[in-house]
Amino acid sequence: MDEIDNIILHSLRQIGCTLDDEVTSLDEFSPTLLVQVVSKCITLIDSSLDLPRTLPPGMAQRFTATASLAEACRTIGYRRDIGYQTFLYSNVAEVRRVLMFLIERLPKESADKAAGTGQPLDVTTELESRICASLQSQLQAPWMPEFCRTAAGPSSSQIAFRRFVPRKLNIPFVTQGDIAAEVKEFWSRQASLDTLDEDSFIPSVIAANDGALKASGGAIDEVDRIKVCSPVDRLQRFYTSSEQKSSVVPVGKVAVEEKLDALAIVEAARPGKTPLESLQEEIDQIRVEIERAVGEGTGLEGERMEVVELCEVQRAAVGKLKDEKKIKERTHILLEDPEVNVRKLQGIIGAGGERMKKLQDQWDVHRIPLEQELEGYRVKHSDKLSQSQQIVDQIEATRHKSEEVMMDLQTKSAMHARLQKELEKLNRTVSRTAYTSRILEIVGNIRKQKTDIDKILQDTRTLQKEINTITGQLDRQFTVTDDLIFRNAKKDEHAKKAYKLLVTLHSDCAELMALVQETGAVKREIRDLEDQIETERSRNTAANLAQICRDLAEMQSESQRLEESLRAHLR
C-alpha cells in the first residue's frame, strides 16, 4: 500500500496540488487537504462544476461543502458509497479508493503533465530548468563588445553597430561669440564633470582635451616632427657639462671618478661603436656603481644597528646611575646634620602615629555598627543560605543532566545528518517507468495468488468428492454389515453383542462427523468476525466518534450563539 500511496502522491504533485514534502502517505491527509485535492481533481475532470476550493471554518458550511463534493464525485461516475463522512471522518481505504478513481478519470494532458522528465514540478526543479535554458541561450549567442549590445540582450537580429561620436562639455553659452574669453575660461574651470550623466562624461572629457591641445597649438600631427636627440648628442652634452663642473669644483675623489666615467662613456660613444652599444656599456657601468652603493649602504646599515644597540645599553646604564645618584644625594643630605634630621624624622613618625590612631578611632566608629548590622543580616538570612545551597545543588544536578542531554543531542544530530545525507543520495523521484514496472509486478503477484487460490479450490473440490465417495461407501458397507449381523443376532449371542457395538460405533462416528462440521463452521465464523474487526479498526471508528462528538458540540455552541443573536435582534 505504501507504493500505491507514493504513486497517488506523485500524480497529485504532477497536476499541481500543493503537498508538503513531509506528506509521504495518505494517513497524513487532513480533511482540509483532502478537500483541496479532491476539488482540484474534479475541476480538471469537469471544469463546469462549481466546487469549494477549501474547507470552511463553520460546521454547517463544512457539511454543505463536503456534501457538494460527494455529489460531484457521483456525477462524474463514482459508484461506491460516498458522502460528507468520507471527507470529514474518512479512513485510509476510502480515501485511497476515491483518489485512485479521480486519478484514473483525469484528462490525458493533465495526467501526462511533466511526464518528459518523470519528476515532480516543484519550485526548485522549475528554477533549475530556467537557469539551464538561460545559460544554454547565452552560450549559443555570438559574442559582441559591450558598446554593440542593445538593451534587449545579445541577439543576432538586434545588433546595432554605433560609431563613437564625441560631445561638447555642457557649459552654458560657451559657443556664443559675444562672450568674453575670460568669462568662457571661468566657465570652463568651474564646470564640474561630476554633474554630467554617464553617456556624456567620457565624450566630454575627450572633447575638452582636444580643445586644450588645439589652444596650445600642439596638434597630434606635429609630434612626429619633433626632433629627438640621439644618445651620442646627450653623451656629448654630459661630457661638456662635466668639463665645466670640473673647472669650478675642486678635484676630489668623487669628481675624478665621475670624470673618468664620463671619459669612458665618450670613448665608448666615439665612431666605431653604435649608439646602442654605447648605451649598453653606460647601463652596465651604472649598474656596477649601483651594486657598489647598495653594498656600502648595507654595511652602513649594519653599523647603524650596532650603534643603536650600543646607545640603548648606554641609556639603560645612565638610568641606573641616575637612580643611584638620587639615593646617594638624599643620604648625603641626611648625614650633613644628623641630630636635626633625626628630630625631624621622629616628629614625622610621631605625627604619623597620632594620625593613624585618629583614623583607627574613626574606622572603629564606622566598623562596629556595620559589623553588628552584618551579623544581624547573617542570622536573618541563614535560612535563605540553606535554601540557596539547595537551589545550587539543583542547578548543578540540572547542569549535569543538561550536559548528558546535549551529548545525546549531538549524537542524534550526527546520526540525523548522516541519515539525511543517505536520504539525499537516494532517488526520491522515481520515474513513471519504475512505477509501471512495479504495477506490473503487483499485477503478476495478484495473478499468481489467483492461480494459487484456484488450485486450492480445485483441491478442495477434489477432496470433497473423495469425502463424499468414501462416506457413500461407508454407508453402504454399514448397511451390508448391519444386515448380515442382524440375521445372525437372532441365533447367536455373540452376534447380538457385535450388532449392538456396531450400532454404537455408527452413532459415535456420526456424532464425531457432526462435531467436526460444527467446528469448521465455528472457525469460519471466527475468521469472518476477525475480518470485520480489522475492517472496523481500519475505519478509525473511535477517532471518528470522538471527532463527531467534538463537531456536535461545536454545532450546538454555534446554534446556541445563533439563537442568542436572534433573540437579541428580536428584542
Curated annotation (Swiss-Prot):
GO biological process terms on file: positive regulation of ubiquitin-dependent protein catabolic process
Keywords of this entry: Coiled coil
Taxonomy, superkingdom: Eukaryota
Transmembrane segments: none
Coiled-coil ranges (or none): 406-434, 509-571
Record InterPro entries: CCDC22, CCDC22_CC, CCDC22_N
UniProt GO MF annotations: cullin family protein binding
Family of the protein in this entry: Belongs to the CCDC22 family.
Protein name: Coiled-coil domain-containing protein 22 homolog
Record organism: Culex quinquefasciatus
Lineage: Eukaryota, Metazoa, Ecdysozoa, Arthropoda, Hexapoda
